[in-house]
Amino acid sequence: MEIGLREWLILIGIIVIAGILFDGWRRMRGGKGKLKFRLDRSYANAPDDEGGAEVLGPSRVLETHKEPELDESDLPSVSAPARERERDPKPAKASKRGKRNHSEPQQGDLNLAAEAREPDLFADDKDDFVADNNRHGAAATPSTPVKELPPAEEVLVISVISRDEGGFKGPALLQNILESGLRFGEMDIFHRHESMAGHGEVLFSMANAVKPGVFDLDDIDHFSTRAVSFFLGLPGPRHPKQAFDVMVAAARKLAHELDGELKDDQRSVLTAQTIEHYRQRIVEFERRALTQKR
């Protein structure tokens, strides 16, 4: 059978069309492979762990939500909580009689038992402490009337701001600070005493950094706050440097376990240099106090 020109043209057209289709299919397949390769490389350059996402977390919160007010107007007066009790002459005499060994664990290896206090100083509130501790897990404050010391000359503040938009939830927050030895007390805020059980002088306190600055234990299950502030007033505890170390440990524990960010009294990120500067302020205050006594 003889093939004419028309048949040849049809055959050539079919071959050309098949070649075009094959070339297009080859290019599409090659493009898919190249796209997949690029996506894999892009993913490989992503942050290795969730730590990177946590670093970016605070920026998103600060851009979309106003940072909680942490100035002194939002905090309760530190003249009373930082120094709830003035030591009577009796404890001084008791300290000469001997030393008392504490059986309760002391956070941050704090040992303030060198100077014993009058054993009966907290006897009046023993029953209240037991009852309130069974109900809330927090110690009640002594009911004995006390004389307040002069207002604080120095206040060391460490704030913990939640990275979560929902803030710190009441039950988790309460559990965390109870583990650090803080107990609910006067002014409806938490205080850290020498003893983990809530006895002894107040070392430092923790307030709600958002107005009105207090906590409601009766509604703690529905409570939440964007930030809390730990503060230590000077003059205050007899051993301010050790008390400050305990406060730093409690703030770090809260920030680590509840995903918070540490801030100083200027609302800047708390650094090792800032902590050292706080310690230097304590040293300078003690030096001035000694000079005034002379």
UniProtKB/Swiss-Prot annotation:
What GO terms fall under cellular component here? cell division site; plasma membrane
Origin organism is Pseudomonas entomophila (strain L48)
Protein name as annotated: Cell division protein ZipA
Function of the molecule: Essential cell division protein that stabilizes the FtsZ protofilaments by cross-linking them and that serves as a cytoplasmic membrane anchor for the Z ring. Also required for the recruitment to the septal ring of downstream cell division proteins.
Task: Give the record's keywords alphabetically.
Answer: Cell cycle, Cell division, Cell inner membrane, Cell membrane, Membrane, Transmembrane, Transmembrane helix
Topology in the lipid bilayer is annotated as:
Single-pass type I membrane protein
Task: State the oligomer form and interacting partners.
Answer: Interacts with FtsZ via their C-terminal domains.
**Biased composition, class Basic and acidic residues, residue ranges:** 82-91
Name the segments for region: Disordered: 64-111, 126-146
Where does the UniProt entry say this protein principally localizes?
A: membrane
Q: What HAMAP family does the database record attribute to this sequence?
A: ZipA
Which is a GO BP term held by this UniProt record? division septum assembly
Family assignment from sequence similarity: Belongs to the ZipA family.
Query: So which stretches are on the Cytoplasmic side?
Result: 23-294
Residue ranges in the Periplasmic topological domain are: 1
